């Protein structure tokens, strides 16, 4: 059973919040677009007109960041880079997750170019903005051909 305390939904048994997300990490796109490496097993991807996509993605990202901040959500923005080329970098939820006990989990990724998304700037932003007490790094499973994208 859950109860509402102010604007927070609380688990009546544990007294802990059911939803604690007031902060999100977003990657501001630079070269967002179709990813040949992930298209082989991602039904959501459709090849389209590539020319306008990076600019449109940046504009949409900026608008979304502004909307979130206007509604009280703290947005940690990591600027993407041109190199290495990471067309899916706007989806960092696939390579890491944070948990309310201070755990950071790093996940093994299928596509080699998705693994390049674990850029120092993104990892630094996570370390600086979340109280990381423990890290579970599952990325070594990539070497065994095992993948678990968050």
Predicted feature residues:
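The feature marks the mature, well-folded catalytic cores of soluble enzymes
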Residues: 1-150
